[in-house]
């Protein structure tokens, strides 16, 4: 179950990163229709939202992986201690 959740998190994170990278690209052959005004923010809010969402997904995935690794090492350490106690 944990492996499938990890895979799903990785796939979603990569998908969001790809979408945010593609959202910033302009189609080839089409020039900018709007002139650049120094006073206006030319960056749309939707790709920024996707960028933040992708960053959160990646941070959560890394936190999940690290938490899983510490749990598995704690489990192995406790398993070794139980094995020592049972042999006494």
Swiss-Prot record:
Keyword hit for Transferase: no
Keyword set, alphabetical order: Secreted, Signal
Cited InterPro entries: DUF4576
GO cellular component: extracellular region
Residues of the signal peptide: 1-23
Disulfide bonds: none
Disordered, as annotated region: 25-45
Composition bias type Basic and acidic residues, residue spans: 25-40
Localization, UniProt: Secreted
Protein known as: Uncharacterized protein C5orf46 homolog
């Amino acid at each position: 179950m944990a492996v499938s959740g990890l895979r799903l998190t990785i796939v979603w994170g990569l998908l969001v990163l790809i979408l945010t990278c593609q959202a910033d690209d302009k189609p080839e052959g089409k020039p900018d229709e709007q002139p650049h005004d120094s006073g206006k923010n030319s960056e749309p809010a939707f790709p920024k939202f996707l960028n933040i969402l992708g960053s959160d997904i990646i941070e959560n995935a890394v936190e999940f992986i690290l938490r899983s690794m510490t749990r598995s090492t704690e489990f192995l350490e406790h398993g070794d201690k139980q094995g020592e106690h049972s042999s006494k």
